[in-house]
Every structure is written in structure tokens, then in C-alpha cells.
């Protein structure tokens, strides 16, 4: 692999991989605030998560869509707004969606499957598994903590099946910011087709939409 976002050379990547060999996370506590769960990790676990985040950003970069704008280096809120303002007048039909209780609905098995398909190694997989499972004390097999270092990246990955499907149709504009996404279409037919795809894919991911 070549060096990527967050790294300047291959040696640094290799050194970070060595640091997490056999690593696991330790959860110190959970609290609930404004409808979301937050986690407190031990200091060593926070260090491991920072390293894992850099490695996951590097390893997942080829698999994450540029249409997912909340990810580092993808434009952010300001870039998304500027882009939409630039193109919106060319399209007659607009639809906006967001996912109900997105973090709470992320299915662990489906997310691990996406990591598998991206070729993520066993050490990173184990850290992600701890990150998902340890706060899941009812053992529901779903949900991510809010405010966690890995959650934005994993949340970006989870909806890549939607990004990939919507990105195939060059007659529409599709952009996403975490679990909020916008579609611009020139015809009602294209918009309806896109909406059907969105509902099908989000249902496959065990998600429900606000509309």
C-alpha cells in the first residue's frame, strides 16, 4: 500500500500496524444524553482508537465515495453547500432524506461485512468489533456510540452501498452528509426511480427514513 491521507510514508503506516497487533478496547462507562449513547474508554483504548482511525482512513479511502461529504478531505458542510448552490438551477426536481436514529440503527454484522469486502485486516476488525460490541450491553447487534472517534468514519462506510448505486446515474446529482442526502433530477421519472432505489437499499441496510 502507498501512503495516504494522514500519513507521509509507508514506514509510519507499518509502525502503526505493529502498535495495534493483538490490541483490544476497554470500556469504562456509558451515559445517555439527548437521545444518544456516549462511551468513556480507558486512556490506552483512546490511543488505540486514534491509531485505528488513521489506518482505517488509509485503508478505506479507495472504498469511500467522494459523494459522502462529511468525511475528512471530502468538502465538509461548506463545500457541499457551495456545490449544491452551483448546480441546483440546472435541475427541476429535488428530494432530501435523512435516516431515523442512524447511529442507533447501524447493524454490526452488515458493517463488518463491508469491512471484510474492503479487505480490512484482522487487528483493525477486532478493534471495530470491540468498539461496536462493548457499548451494546443489551446485545442487540446494532448501534454505535455518539461522539466516538470511529463513528463518523464507520457511519460514512455503512451507507456506501447507497453512494455506489446512486453515483451510477449521471443524469442526477446525489450528495450525502453522514445520514442526510440530497437528490437533484431533471425529470420526475428520474426522481421517482431514485427514490425507489433509496428505499430499497436503506431497507436492505435495516434503516428507516424520515421524508
What do the PLM-derived regions correspond to, one by one?
Residues 21, 25, 50-53, 57, ...:
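N-proximal short alpha-helices
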Residues 14, 53-59, 142-146:
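A broad, low-specificity signal for short, low-complexity segments enriched in glycine/proline
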Residues 31-66, 135:
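Glycine/proline-rich, flexible active-site/cofactor-binding loop segments
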Residues 1-16:
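Non-catalytic, polymerase-adjacent accessory regions of viral genome-replication enzymes
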Residues 76:
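Soluble or luminal CAZymes and related metallo-dependent hydrolases
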Residues 13-34, 88, 122-136:
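Reverse-transcriptase-like RNA-dependent polymerase core
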Residues 66-67, 72, 81, 85-211:
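Conserved polymerase palm-domain catalytic core
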Residues 6-8, 49-55, 137-141, 186:
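Short low-complexity stretches enriched in small and charged residues
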Amino acid at each position: 500500500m502507498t501512503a495516504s491521507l494522514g500519513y507521509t510514508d509507508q514506514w509510519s503506516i507499518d509502525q502503526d500496524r505493529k502498535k495495534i497487533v493483538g490490541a483490544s478496547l476497554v470500556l469504562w462507562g456509558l451515559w445517555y444524553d439527548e437521545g444518544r449513547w456516549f462511551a468513556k474508554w480507558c486512556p490506552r483504548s483512546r490511543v488505540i482508537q486514534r491509531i485505528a482511525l488513521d489506518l482505517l482512513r488509509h485503508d478505506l479511502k479507495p472504498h469511500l465515495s467522494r459523494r459522502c461529504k462529511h468525511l475528512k478531505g471530502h468538502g465538509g458542510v461548506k463545500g457541499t453547500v457551495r456545490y449544491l448552490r452551483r448546480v441546483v438551477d440546472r435541475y427541476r426536481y429535488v428530494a432530501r432524506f435523512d435516516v431515523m436514529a442512524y447511529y442507533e440503527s447501524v447493524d454490526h454484522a452488515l458493517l463488518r461485512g463491508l469491512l471484510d469486502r474492503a479487505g480490512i485486516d484482522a487487528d483493525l476488525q477486532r478493534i471495530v468489533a470491540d468498539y461496536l460490541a462493548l457499548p451494546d450491553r443489551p446485545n442487540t447487534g446494532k448501534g454505535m456510540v455518539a461522539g466516538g472517534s470511529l463513528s463518523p468514519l464507520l457511519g460514512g462506510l455503512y451507507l456506501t452501498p447507497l453512494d455506489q448505486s446512486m453515483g451510477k446515474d449521471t443524469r442526477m446529482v446525489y450528495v450525502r452528509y453522514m445520514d442526510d442526502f440530497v437528490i437533484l433530477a431533471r425529470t420526475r421519472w428520474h426522481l421517482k426511480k431514485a427514490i425507489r432505489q433509496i428505499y430499497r437499499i436503506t431497507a436492505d441496510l435495516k434503516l428507516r427514513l424520515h421524508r
